[in-house]
Amino acid sequence: MPPAPLITIVDDDDFLRNSLNNLLRSVGMRTHSFSSAEEFLNSNELHDTDCLLLDVRMPGMSGLDLQRQLNASNSRIPIVFITSHADDDARARALAAGAVAFLYKPCRKEALLEAIDLALNHKVP
């Protein structure tokens, strides 16, 4: 049996990271979490990640900047953005650059799990 999908959470909000970790583990997924894009890029999780849950606005490198860097390196990690800032321009840029979904905090559990499922089932090898 293949291992459970690894969902990596990159968000500067400690409470949200912990909540997402608990939710995703409760439905059988493995998780890793990071408080910044830089921390994620410097980790060993980059190549093992099956789906990336990514905040848009963070200190240092933004989620959109991380997406650009991953795209430039030909990364195939599907990205689901989660943000508390209603920003139509950021949403349009993220989706145009290949994000699977762009959700607003707080989002419904069902919407998040549906977006992750979509990302996992449309992952490019």
Locate the predicted segments by residue.
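Short, conserved "switch-loop" micro-motifs in signal-transduction and mechanochemical regulators
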Residues: 73, 84-86
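C-terminal output helix
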Residues: 89, 107-116
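Receiver (REC) domain active-site loop signature in two-component systems and cognate sites
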Residues: 58
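Acidic, metal-coordinating helix/loop segments flanking the phosphotransfer/catalytic sites
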Residues: 33-51
